[in-house]
Amino acid sequence: SYRGLYVLCEGNMGSNKATLDYLDMTTGRYSRNIYPSRNPGKVMELGDVGNDIKVYGSRLWMVINQSNRVEVASAASAVSLGSVDIPNVRFLAFDGKYAYVSSYVGPVNGPSVLGEV
């Protein structure tokens, strides 16, 4: 069963202010901007314009549109597992062991592997 809810806050375009918030549904406590505190040795701000968020398996996937990145973290702890750089990434979906992303960078000639986390 779920014990909480992640909220990806978009932030203002051009300000590098996207944040990840968390609502603990067992206590009702809402925590703002948890990503830097969960990743003290690595993380700064999440990036510019949080656009999409999904939990798939044990991972939390966050699309940071204007930063051209998909950030991947542990769904249980929000600790960063890595990221994949994708120009103008917008949305993501999953099927089996693959994540599919949309991008408005231009035409695509076929599927390609952009990264692995």
Question: What does each model-found stretch correspond to?
Answer:
Residues 1-28:
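An edge-strand/N-cap motif at the start of beta-rich repeat modules
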Residues 11-16, 67-69, 105-110:
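Short glycine/acidic-enriched loop and turn motifs that connect beta-strands
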Residues 29-45, 76-84:
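A short beta-strand motif characteristic of beta-propeller blades
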